[in-house]
Amino acid sequence: MIPLTSITDPVTDPGLAVSCRGIRKHFGEGETRVEALRGVDFTARAGELSFLVGPSGCGKTTLLSVIAGILDPSGGDLTVLGERVDALSARDRILFRRKNLGFVFQQYNLLPALTAAENVAVPLLAAGARRPPSLERAEALLDRLGLGARTGALPATLTGGQQQRVAIARALVHEPRLVVCDEPTAALDHESGESVMELLADNVVRPDRAVIVVTHDSRVLHHADSIARMDDGRIVNTTRPGDSLPAATQRST
């Protein structure tokens, strides 16, 4: 069992990619108030692939959205890649996310008028990179994900699983230091899911990078460096490879 809190300083410890201390998030007020996160303590280390598992509605996606800066926490301390994100101005927060983070959410949001390769290259082109090498890198990533023959296809002609792989390639193309993924293998068969997880694992070979994955897919848990289980808006346990998972964790991933 791993302690749920860290005694290190998340701002000065280069090994901590993400540090959540007492993170709370609620929606609504009064009788409609819902406590989605109830004082979450969670860390993700650089050079590791961290998983969040637990029953539907337990707060996994909300926590991921807070870490990604899409939702503001209602309370607690959040440090991402050494930055106290809540202390940044709105503009600096956007620039920080654009430079350092990659996102894979269940809504792929592919641009319908662009090809698969062009969609993947968007982060590079938005940062001012030249078009030919950007497309070349995009095509190489798509090829690794089994879409080498579909790089010129429009999103409307792709299956849901193919669109998901395009979104994953887009999240990785600019080599972000932190990648957050919500159910990245949900629409994929086992072989495609393994290709995705291998690509994500490759991203953490460098010690300054980290990946956080929310999943219900127990088939991919063997890729994890750590597995944190959530229930009712809290982290209830964290395990490492070789630890035996509690039965409840195995049932509710």
Give, region by region, the residue ranges found by the protein language model:
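H-loop (His-switch) and adjacent beta-strand-loop-beta switch element
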Residues: 227-240
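ABC family nucleotide-binding domain
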Residues: 16-230
